[in-house]
Amino acid sequence: MARRKLALAVLPLVAFACSAYDTHAVGEAYYRGRPEEASRHLGELLEADPEGRALYLNERGVLELEAGNYDGAYRDFVEANQIMEALGGSTSDEVGAIVGQEASKIWRGEPYEKSMNGYYLGVVELLRGVDDNARAGFKNAIFFDSSNQGEQYQCDFAPAYFLEGFASGRLGDATTFDADLQRAHELVPDAPVFKPETKGNLVVIVDVGRGPTKIATGAHGEEIRFVEHPERPARIDVVADGTKLGEVEHAGGDVYYQATTRGGRVFDRILKGKAIYKSAAQAAGITTLVMADEFKGRGETAAVITGLALILSSIFVRAEADTRHWTTLPCEVQLFRGTLSPGAHEIQIVPSTGRVAIQSARTIEVPAHGDVVIYARVLN
């Protein structure tokens, strides 16, 4: 009977879970229109959790990009990129993830997050006028959307192709520009921005809405699922000097789609091995403790030790999936290309619903030769 009581006493330990750092509070503050609060949270996380540094730098990079601090955004995205592309070894920092919580390791992101890091590096460098680095960033976005841990897929993130081609055109590489534009057009044939006849000296990049939320499901939280936030404006107008120039277009930049597919095929990631062991060890440990009364002498002691060992191992082998994710990503990347006469123009980004983060209107100077890139973020 005493052994049965002991079995019941250790049951609460099975439910014990180690807390992990994440950026949930950052995302909530950001989408409520409180970027200063989001920035404060990120400062605290950067101080407290070195293992999540790449995640926090990416989140902060988005805030800096929207605030027009392109140099700061560049530094954050570059450092995050260096961490995310590093190959994990069996160091003491990584071994904890084998027997501990899945989130207790260095955050390097899912393939779609690595791809979006490359996308943002490209956007920032376009805005800074560093076109070779911009092209490299978009090339990275294409690469990480098409490969993962040795597996090869076909990149289907059309904006990355268009923007790599655009940066290549700025560098005088017409061959890459034509090839990338053709690939983007093949992916989204209905998007006017990808048609060869669409030309212009103004390119507008608009990140729209809220990106996917990563959650854990399953008996032990071992399954990863992504929750979509589909709310977005029905229309986003580009207005120049008080006159509508055109509408920003859906251009195959669905981030939820990128998160949940590989080469267009839906996938689910499950940490099955840990989950199976955890369930089996819990059941075997509790059963052994309950049956310990049936043994005598040394057998009874051995049964107790074995039962406790199994239960403790089930506690420390954590099956929970890592749900840390980049909360400030958009749900969609939209694009526009049009033509303005050389000189100064006031440009407004006007969504049918929602709001433009930080700045909805800005004055630009269109050169006699060359083009201008504008970036905006629209939130609901």
Q: What name fits each language-model region?
A:
Residues H41, D76, I83, G137, ...:
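Alpha-helical solenoid repeat scaffolds, predominantly canonical TPR units
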Residues H24, E59, L63-E66, E113-Y120, ...:
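"A position-specific structural signal for the A-helix of alpha-solenoid helical repeats
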Residues A15-E37, L46:
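Bacterial Sec signal peptide processing site at the extreme N-terminus
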Residues E44-E51, M84-G109, D145-Q154, A191-F194:
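Flexible helix-coil transition and linker loops at the boundaries of alpha-helical arrays
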Residues D178, E186, T198-N380:
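Short loop/turn and low-complexity linker motifs enriched in small/turn-promoting residues
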Residues A20, L55, M116, G150-Q152, ...:
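Start-of-helix register in tetratricopeptide repeats
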